[in-house]
From Swiss-Prot:
Keywords: Amino-acid biosynthesis, Aromatic amino acid biosynthesis, Cytoplasm, Transferase
Gene name, Swiss-Prot/TrEMBL: aroA
Descriptive protein name: 3-phosphoshikimate 1-carboxyvinyltransferase
Keyword set includes Transferase: yes
Species: Rhodococcus erythropolis (strain PR4 / NBRC 100887)
Subcellular location: Cytoplasm
Subcellular location, principal: cytoplasm
Coiled-coil ranges per UniProt: none
Amino acid sequence: MDHVSLSLWSAPRAQAPVDAVVTLPGSKSITNRALILAALADGPSTITGALRSRDADLMIAALRDLGIGVEEAGDPTTLRITPGPLRGGEVDCGLAGTVMRFLPPLAAMADGIVRFDGDEQARTRPLGTILEALRGLGARIEGDALPFTVTGTGSLRGGTVTIDASGSSQFVSGLLLSAAAFEEGVTVHHDGKPVPSMPHIDMTVEMLRQSGVSVTTPATGGDADTWRVAPGPVRAVDWAIEPDLSNATPFLAAAAVTGGTVSVPMWPSSTTQPGDAIRGILASMGADVTLADGVLTVRGPEKLRGIDIDLHDVGELTPTVAALAALAEGTSHLRGIAHLRGHETDRLAALADEINKLGGSVTETDDGLTIVPAELHGGQWLSYADHRMATAGAIIGLVVDGVDVDDVGTTAKTLPGFENMWIDMLESSPATPKASF
């Protein structure tokens, strides 16, 4: 896999079991959905606890360029969004899947030409599915991948479309989020292998309903693999953003691999975020996991167990789980994640390559990874401009000397300041190593 090293970060080795409380910023997935819905709303909205990361800031910049008012209200995480007539503009997607897949439907309703581009790595990410679907709904689009151009005509007909969303749930979410503003709404039917990351579609549906939009799903009497959004107003909602649970997983993994304790406050008792699945995963690997009074606490075991798990619905957790598995006793099988080959990088090949370079024993399968315990050693860990690859390297570096993570700054995609948070976690832990560590 081609990769150019940008800089090296020496992942700090834990000198003792970690013992820390880690407060996480807002969810990227919820923040960017709230921004789209606020842009389409029938009045101004306020978003509190918004994530301010590269992905979120790219979404904000794009909306501003298209004519939406987005202003900070007192602090950077509180945003006031004022809808306005959509106009032509330029959209820099960076590496953000939510930007490149959620904004084209909005752009199709602009009055003017909207040009999309992004980072070089983004030009290989699959987009043809949603762009072809939009053409079928009446949009004028040139191109099937970045860069592409949407010629907005001020409105979009909408209607019924059949797609293969087995590559990404974002194809479905992207069409649903703007569909209430389409003249006919939209009916999206999926035809293909199972859609990955279904919790993200559940998140989209829940937020649409909170905005007063009528949504019919397979779970509410609709046809199988079919989602229907009726045309109508999007109600202005004041959004309070949950912490990003997927970004919490490296810190919780730190407790698991060092036999320590990490607590994360403001953990929701009920959520559509896929990151919530880390609770059951860590428990299956031997950790003690409790959620009480909004605080999730993970206490690591003496010995971490391997795991056999289907991660199809929670694929974004794969780098964290792979790092855990590489440090566990017993073989692990991570299944149902063939779609990760189309993420920021081919995450399956990247994880196998990087763990094996450190002495690991990882084999790619058709739909996942098999990870056999092996003695790991230090070395360079490439991030492939992928934020979750970088944090996976940091996890391994907690217990393996000399792991140097390249381009750790890519974590700013969803978690700015990750390196400082990681060091703060270690510095808040006891200085005296335990004998069992």
